[in-house]
Design a protein with these regions (language model features):
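Alpha/beta-hydrolase fold catalytic core
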Residues: 2-54, 74-78, 117-118, 275-278, ...
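Conserved hydrolase catalytic core segment
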Residues: 118-160
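Flexible "cap/lid" loop of the alpha/beta hydrolase fold
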Residues: 146-185
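Conserved alpha/beta-hydrolase catalytic His-Asp/Glu region
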Residues: 157-163, 181-241
Length: 306
């Protein structure tokens, strides 16, 4: 596995002790949010008025990951902030049994239909990007356009040896071991050193890493374990041609790994089957683009949202 795929693998697989989150740039002020709506698998808050933009964070990450973009985005948009139950240390709800990703999609669709948000712009980071693709596949009318931030239609390609076409069946046994190891950490204290180990390489700024460590320690490892397992065995590559909503793939690069020359071809290969896809790259950034380059990320996000 080369250093580029290793970095992405860490972003998805690192939680073998407790798990990395993806975290956003924190603004000094925040838009006023509505009261929280709790559902079986997610909770939702809203801010602002205008055309709807749904923000879905990644594995073991609270909605606060988007704090740095919400104030500006809410000036012209109705911002819907999703949080997976248990990822912020809250009640896990129905997320302690299999089918979490499908449950998230079901809850999102129900919220969109009830609140007349069909055709919304949807943004998902890491695991949230996978959920966005699942939503577009299952409920195409829900999504007007989709932004995928440093995510893949099949995360397990990162574990494939050169020349091997990996399948969910091949990955499932190892994914199950990872799930069980993570779940077994529930209720056990995690040291700062362990947290640092799990967040290493996912952002470039020291203050970002500090926030990531705090969030990693707060997430319910039982939920993290199940969602990680489902991430690894979910393969949407063959579904890409049927996703008609325009897709924007936003990915990072830096002077180490991945370089711009490495990242571009890799992502284009993963999304080659999508009929309507554009690519946006942000340099001097790692997996948590919104932390490393908050201004560039906000600019790309507002351009996407319209």
């Amino acid at each position: 596995m080369n250093h580029f795929t290793l970095r992405l693998a860490v972003a998805v697989l690192a939680p073998l002790a407790i798990l990395q989150p993806n975290i956003g740039h924190c603004a000094p002020t925040a838009a006023t949010s509505t009261g929280e709506v709790r559902m079986d698998h997610i909770s939702v808050t809203e801010a602002g008025k205008g055309s709807p933009v749904i923000l879905i964070p990644g594995l073991a990450t609270p909605r606060a990951v988007w704090d740095g973009v919400v104030p500006e985005l809410a000036k012209n948009h109705r911002v819907i902030l999703v949080q997976v139950n248990g990822f912020a240390g809250d009640d896990p709800g129905a997320n302690l049994k299999p089918g979490v990703l499908d449950g998230i999609v079901t809850d999102l669709d129900a919220y969109i239909v009830k609140n007349k948000l069909t055709g919304a712009a949807v943004v998902g980071h890491s695991m949230g990007g996978l959920v966005g693709m699942m939503l577009a596949k299952a409920h195409p009318g829900d999504i007007g356009k989709l932004m995928i931030v440093d995510s893949l239609p099949f995360f397990a390609v990162l574990r494939a040896p050169p020349g091997v076409e990996v399948t969910p069946a091949m990955v499932a046994p190892q994914a199950a071991v990872a799930r069980d190891k993570i779940a077994a950490t529930y209720g056990k204290p995690m040291s700062d050193a362990d947290a640092a180990s799990q967040t290493k390489g996912l952002a470039l700024k020291p203050d970002s890493i500090t926030k990531m460590k705090a969030w990693a320690m707060k997430a319910d490892s039982r939920v993290t374990a199940e969602v990680l397992y489902e991430d690894l065995i979910t393969d949407l590559r063959s579904d890409l041609p049927s996703i008609k909503a325009p897709i924007t793939v936003l990915y990072p690069w830096n002077s180490g790994y991945p370089t711009r020359e490495m990242a571009g071809p890799f992502y284009r290969k993963q999304y080659a089957a999508a009929p309507n896809v554009t690519y946006v790259d942000i340099g001097d950034a790692a997996h948590f683009v919104m932390l490393d380059q908050p201004d560039a990320f906000l600019k790309a996000l507002t351009a996407f949202a319209g």
